[in-house]
């Protein structure tokens, strides 16, 4: 079975041509559209539906940078969502707790400037995390990338 990159004829790497992904997706969807299988056998309809479902899943996965990163790690034997990965950096956990407390306080008091500041901080942290993930994937350091992705999913 093909992986999602092969399915869309894209290089197996983090940086992909999103326009190329979109075009490949639309081409496959046109080929397996139900209107084309009105007079087909049940087996042909089922196969077309399976192709459409795979195209949808592959498109959602590759179109999202975090999902794409996790998928690349998993293709290379590093499972991001495994329950066995329960330990996190204590500093990271403390930062998460602090942010959640500040967020709760800002919501309860209606402190809009604080909410905006927290959102800005979170965006900055997420951008830095994505840079770490991309650099790790480019260097084929899948364990580092997987660890950072877990933080992003926390």
Which role fits each region the language model picked out?
Residues 1-154:
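C-terminal accessory/regulatory regions appended to core domains
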């Amino acid at each position: 079975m093909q992986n999602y990159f092969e399915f869309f004829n894209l290089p197996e790497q983090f940086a992909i041509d999103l326009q190329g992904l979109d075009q490949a997706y639309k081409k496959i969807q046109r080929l397996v559209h139900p209107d084309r299988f009105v007079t087909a056998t049940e087996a042909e309809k089922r196969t077309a539906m399976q192709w459409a479902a795979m195209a949808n899943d592959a498109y959602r996965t590759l179109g999202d940078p975090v999902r794409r990163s996790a998928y690349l790690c998993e293709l290379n034997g590093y499972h991001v969502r495994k329950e066995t990965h329960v330990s996190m950096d204590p500093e990271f956990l403390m930062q998460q707790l602090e942010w959640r407390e500040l967020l709760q306080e800002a919501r309860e008091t209606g402190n809009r400037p604080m909410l905006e500041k927290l959102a800005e901080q979170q965006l900055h942290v997420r951008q830095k995390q994505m840079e770490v993930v991309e650099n790790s994937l480019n260097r084929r350091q899948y364990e580092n990338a997987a660890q950072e992705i877990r933080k992003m999913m926390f």
